[in-house]
Amino acid sequence: MRKIYKVIIYVMIIIILTVLYARFIGTSFLKVKEYPVYSDSVPNDFDGIKIIHFSDLHYKRAITREKIDKIVDEINLIKPDIVVFTGDLIDKDSIIVEDDIKYLKSTLSKINAKYAKYAVMGNHDYNKIETVENIYNDAGFNYLNNSYDIIYGKNSGKIFISGISSVSYKQDDMTSALEYLKDNKDIDYKIVLVHEPDFAENIINEYSVDLILSGHSHNGQIRIPLVGALYTPENAKKYYDEYYSINNTDLYISSGIGVSKYNYRLFNHPSFNLYRIYKEKTS
């Protein structure tokens, strides 16, 4: 009987320590994940371009201003060419006051990018959509609401960047975001931002794009070694890990900065991604 009690006590201790770790350690220690991306579509003008991708801040839920300040500093140390944010700036359950709005505008405006900064809405943002849009605009982000932008290189190279609004709230309009590509074949490298990664197949089935960047899944906020993600949200059931190659398209999914639903992360620290985009050498 004593052995059984000992086992129970040990199990309880392990559970308590795991919960404490997931709450306080797992949600800390920001990581930068670096990926080289190769494509023969990359124009010479943009060979080696650096793109920072961060997502799912879920402000005011297990994330402090000090952590956001650190993220901004880390991004600026890299000196990115392009910065993209793929949604869920503010957690839907958070209460936001004017001081929070001023802080986010001021702090996110400090992120520097050589060419431009872009953002799309996530499903959590629709509870405060006007506030989030206002923050994006005042912080110097181009808000891509089923729209696109083109970055021009010095020698006629073109990068197309499109943003599709949240699929979860049925705000997506793929035609408005991407129809330009069907009539304009002179675009070199094509990037799409969409919060929910499962929508990637819809895009790829209709349009030829090179790179899709998403968030939403947090790569499975709670992960177990050899098992993987224990839970992923709707619209991130098929695609939720860090990377997928679908036909000729690269899909990268950020694990995010904040937390959603539960204030825990296990074997999955907060992170943002750095992509170095290279022109693939063909023989």
Predicted segments with their positions:
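Binuclear metal-dependent hydrolase catalytic cores centered on His/Asp/Glu-rich metal-binding motifs
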Residues: N134, D138-F141, S147-Y148, G153-V194, ...
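Membrane-embedded segments
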Residues: D45-L144
